[in-house]
Amino acid sequence: MERRAIIDIGSNSVRLIIYKINRDSTFKVLNEAKRTIRLGSYLTENDYLADNGLDILLKVLRVFKSICERYDVIEIYVVATEAIRRSINKNDLCNKVK
């Protein structure tokens, strides 16, 4: 069974869902995690995501990556909401996340 994960980076929290896809195309959630980091509060008046906010996000993503490795996840999908879409340095953030 293939195992995949979704990471949702929101303005207030980062969520992880790990699931397995069964042969009949159904899926089962294996693990869920959530960290509240209030990423939106690290956006400056000019919509720049401050370095300390980025550092906190990267720490959470490293933890989530290690959880995914323990579950033998073959693919991780990352989506981001308002705080990331609005930030003028989102390309830098995306490169660091990769």
What is the meaning of each model-derived region?
Residues M1-I9, I17-K98:
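Nucleotide/phosphate-binding catalytic cleft detector across ATP-hydrolyzing
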